[in-house]
């Protein structure tokens, strides 16, 4: 789930924190990708006639096709991906996981009813709701990545938290996921739609945490409290407090404790045994990979082993897989170039689709030229 309504809230109240780019803009960038989120997207999107791709034994292969070709596309555009896989979910997430199980059970009932009624659109909708990333999906994707020469890491807990830690440490330029709580975990830059289907033609969205905090007038701990009020995977929120009201309350009172002291409990009942303090601690000090111990290396693909796995075991076309390997090898030759802004300071500012910031004048203009977007430039 991530954080409910956070993307829209940022677009509404801190639009300069969002930048849209074409994939070509990320040449030379290292990016930490939430693997489970990507695999889920592949299982949803890579389909034939509404059904997931399968081999003759009935094994699902959509995740492998998606991982293979989307990774090649990133490499061809000069992006160096590292995939981060989920570890053990935190105990605080048990309530959210139980709710998901309930929703799956309900979707199974609705799917059966839709099948009996012959309602094709409803069947497709509820089938997608039942999609779940399994250990087998993860293990097969790890094997594929190792054969492709693409690094992956196992997070001790939530993948997006470790993605954020790598970005904070400067090991990568950004964390890539659809879950907005990557910002809550402190990633300086969050990228959305990086692994989305090309057919959707979605521009990649960048969310810059420093601009979010600046425009909202909050520090990181206050931003975490705002996200808890909006609704997260780790504890309940206060019913009746919408996004705009949550922002107003945090800006005025600075913490959940101060807000609760002033709330009318008859209008805004606080959840019983509310675990907001524990959720705050989890966001501020999550269990993550140690960035200093991480060494990222992209190596040559093992063509024959890839053919053996993807064609021999999973029954993909050998011609297509070998063609993909050629593209991958060619992309590796091109990606040895660095980015110009790794050597020269880049000036400018983030643009917003919603609001263009006024051009500074006089001394302010001179100051803006020497500062600009340098604070957003990350050298990895």
Swiss-Prot record:
Acetylated by EP300. Acetylation inhibits both endonuclease and exonuclease activity. Acetylation also reduces DNA-binding activity but does not affect interaction with PCNA or EP300. Mg(2+) 1 binds at residues 34, 86, 158, 160. It is found in: Nucleus, Nucleolus; Nucleus, Nucleoplasm; Mitochondrion. Residues 122-253 are annotated as: I-domain. The modification Phosphoserine is found at residues 187, 197, 255, 293, 335. The modification Phosphothreonine is found at residue 336. GO terms for cellular component: chromosome, telomeric region; mitochondrion; nucleolus; nucleoplasm; nucleus; protein-containing complex. Residues 363-380 have a biased composition (Basic residues). One of its GO terms (molecular function) is manganese ion binding. Its cofactor is Mg(2+). DNA binds at residues 47, 70, 158, 231, 233. The modification Symmetric dimethylarginine is found at residues 19, 100, 104, 192. Binds 2 magnesium ions per subunit. They probably participate in the reaction catalyzed by the enzyme. May bind an additional third magnesium ion after substrate binding. InterPro entries: 5-3_exonuclease_C_sf, Flap_endonuc, HhH2, PIN-like_dom_sf, XPG-I_dom, XPG/Rad2, XPG_CS, XPG_DNA_repair_N. Mg(2+) 2 binds at residues 179, 181, 233. Residues 1-104 are annotated as: N-domain. The keyword Cytoplasm does not apply. Keywords: Acetylation, DNA damage, DNA repair, DNA replication, Endonuclease, Exonuclease, Hydrolase, Magnesium, Metal-binding, Methylation, Mitochondrion, Nuclease, Nucleus, Phosphoprotein. The modification N6-acetyllysine is found at residues 80, 354, 375, 380. Belongs to the XPG/RAD2 endonuclease family. FEN1 subfamily. Structure-specific nuclease with 5'-flap endonuclease and 5'-3' exonuclease activities involved in DNA replication and repair. During DNA replication, cleaves the 5'-overhanging flap structure that is generated by displacement synthesis when DNA polymerase encounters the 5'-end of a downstream Okazaki fragment. It enters the flap from the 5'-end and then tracks to cleave the flap base, leaving a nick for ligation. Also involved in the long patch base excision repair (LP-BER) pathway, by cleaving within the apurinic/apyrimidinic (AP) site-terminated flap. Interacts with PCNA. Three molecules of FEN1 bind to one PCNA trimer with each molecule binding to one PCNA monomer. PCNA stimulates the nuclease activity without altering cleavage specificity. The C-terminal domain binds EP300; can bind simultaneously to both PCNA and EP300. Interacts with DDX11; this interaction is direct and increases flap endonuclease activity of FEN1. Interacts with WDR4; regulating its endonuclease activity. Interacts with POLB. This is Flap endonuclease 1. It comes from Rattus norvegicus (Rat). The lineage of its organism: Eukaryota, Metazoa, Chordata, Craniata, Vertebrata.
């Amino acid at each position: 789930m991530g954080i409910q309504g956070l993307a829209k809230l940022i677009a509404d109240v801190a639009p300069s924190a969002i930048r849209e780019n074409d994939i070509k803009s990320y040449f030379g960038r290292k990016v930490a990708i939430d693997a489970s989120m990507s695999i889920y997207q592949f299982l949803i999107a890579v389909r034939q006639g509404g059904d997931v791709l399968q081999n003759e034994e009935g094994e699902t292969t959509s995740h492998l096709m998606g991982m293979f070709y989307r990774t090649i596309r990133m490499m061809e555009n000069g992006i160096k991906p590292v995939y981060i896989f989920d570890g053990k979910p935190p105990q605080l997430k048990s309530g959210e996981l139980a709710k998901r199980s309930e929703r799956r059970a309900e979707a199974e009932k609705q799917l059966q009813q839709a099948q009996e009624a012959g309602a094709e659109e409803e069947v497709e909708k509820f089938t997608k709701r039942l999609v779940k990333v399994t250990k087998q999906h993860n293990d097969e994707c790890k094997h594929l990545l190792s054969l492709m020469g693409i690094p992956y890491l196992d997070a001790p807990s939530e993948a997006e938290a470790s993605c954020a830690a790598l970005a904070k440490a400067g090991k990568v330029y950004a964390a890539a996921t659809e879950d907005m709580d990557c910002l809550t975990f402190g990633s300086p830059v969050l990228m959305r739609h990086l692994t989305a289907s090309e057919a959707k033609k979605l521009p990649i969205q960048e969310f810059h945490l420093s601009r979010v905090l600046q425009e909202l007038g909050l520090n990181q701990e206050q931003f975490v409290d705002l996200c808890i009020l909006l609704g997260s995977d780790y504890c309940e929120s206060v019913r009746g407090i919408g996004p705009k009201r949550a922002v107003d309350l945090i800006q005025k009172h600075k913490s959940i404790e101060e807000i609760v002291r002033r709330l009318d409990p008859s209008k805004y009942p606080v959840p019983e045994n509310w675990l907001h303090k524990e959720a705050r601690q989890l966001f501020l000090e999550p269990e993550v990979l140690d960035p200093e111990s991480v060494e990222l290396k992209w190596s040559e693909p093992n063509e024959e082993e890839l053919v053996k796995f993807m064609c021999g075991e999973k029954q993909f076309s050998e011609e297509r897989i070998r063609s993909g390997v050629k593209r991958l090898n060619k992309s590796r030759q091109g990606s040895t170039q660095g980015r110009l802004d790794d050597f020269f300071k880049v000036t400018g500012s983030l643009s917003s689709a919603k609001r263009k910031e006024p051009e500074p004048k006089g001394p302010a203009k001179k100051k803006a030229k020497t500062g600009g977007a340098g604070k957003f430039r990350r050298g990895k």
